[in-house]
């Protein structure tokens, strides 16, 4: 999937599609554990689960000018105040700036990756966060999403992370974000295996819309942006 001129592997940024002159970028962040100091591997299930998202996002983007990459974590866990995946995400953004310049970037994160994406949203390159079944404990900071777009999809039947806590975070973020939307995926689970095609297609369409709002339709209905009950799709 990687284009010509791609750098060798290693480091926090792993390019999957690398145009010669990117105008924008998408970084994908997989899930992990609350605590875990063992090394993160690309063959761990949390990382493997995001591969269909890589393919779906790539299929919906113009390869000639949008860079697609994943963030490589050093460790498997969040690890308390260390917030190791946030450090890795910020390092990936630093490397991205070296590679492509200060291009507008969308972060797509699942579970722990959604938490890392939220925390890294204040980076000057980040324009939007797409959080999938995010792990957002009560009281997560939202000041850093000021001026950014926030899209959240959470499985209606998720028993690992809390749709209610995601909804509470989105409500607080609406006071500072450019726009904030949330939808529940009907019958959806944390691993995003039930209705997997819907997860993949809706995520890819949301990313395409965030990068080209005038040219690509928003896959989410207007109710997702309102203050009422979170709609079920």
What is the role of each PLM region?
Residues 4, 178-233:
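C-terminal catalytic histidine-bearing segment of alpha/beta-hydrolase fold enzymes
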């Amino acid at each position: 999937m990687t284009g010509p001129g791609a750098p060798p592997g290693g480091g926090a940024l792993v390019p999957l599609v690398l145009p010669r002159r990117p105008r924008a970028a998408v970084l994908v962040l997989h899930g992990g554990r609350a605590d875990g100091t063992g090394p993160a591997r690309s063959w761990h299930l949390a990382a493997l689960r995001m591969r269909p998202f890589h393919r779906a996002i790539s299929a919906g983007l113009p390869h000639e000018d949008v860079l697609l990459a994943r963030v490589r974590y050093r460790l498997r866990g969040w690890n308390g105040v260390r917030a190791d995946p946030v450090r890795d995400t910020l390092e990936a953004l630093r490397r991205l700036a070296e590679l492509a310049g200060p291009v507008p970037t969308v972060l797509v994160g699942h579970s722990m990756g959604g938490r890392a994406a939220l925390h890294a949203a204040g980076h000057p390159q980040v324009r939007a966060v797409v959080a999938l079944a995010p792990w957002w404990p009560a009281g997560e900071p939202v000041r850093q999403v000021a001026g950014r777009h926030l899209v959240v999809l959470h499985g209606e039947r998720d028993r690992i992370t809390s749709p209610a806590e995601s909804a509470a975070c989105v409500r607080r973020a609406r006071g500072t974000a450019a726009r904030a939307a949330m939808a529940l995926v009907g019958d959806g689970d944390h691993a995003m295996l039930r209705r997997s095609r819907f997860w993949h297609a809706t995520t890819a369409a949301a990313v395409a819309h965030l990068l080209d709002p005038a040219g690509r339709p928003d896959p989410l209905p207007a109710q997702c942006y309102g203050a009422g009950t979170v709609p079920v799709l």
